[in-house]
Amino acid sequence: MSITPYLLYEDVAGALKFLSKAFGLKKSGQTMKGADGKLNHAAMQLGDDLIMMGYPGKKYKNPKRLGQSTQSLYINVDDVDKHFARAKKAGAKILEQPQDTFYGHRRYGAEDPEGHQWYFAQEIAKSQKA
């Protein structure tokens, strides 16, 4: 079983470029263009994780259009500090600097140009059961 988030982007082609450059995601699978010729569906992968994206149309709103974020993604990576440096260099808006958490992860938070919040983490210690 797995979960595949579906994120909404006004500029799907721009999201593909940014997410690749900043977060290391790779284009995966088929893309689809709308009647206007613009890309309106794509999928990307980070390791074994798949993330799909599409144009929101009139029925839905992405964080940019809504004016706030309603969810975030939490993704485990091998080297969170190296990942942070890449995201920062690529122009991601940094929400949280890398920090160690009480639950045994080192993580940072970033926001993409359309307002989606991404948290990347690395396990640094096994968490203790309560």
Regions found by a protein language model. Give the residues of each.
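Vicinal oxygen chelate
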Residues: 1-8, 16-17, 23-78, 82-111, ...
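C-terminal catalytic core of tyrosine-transesterase DNA break-rejoin enzymes
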Residues: 114
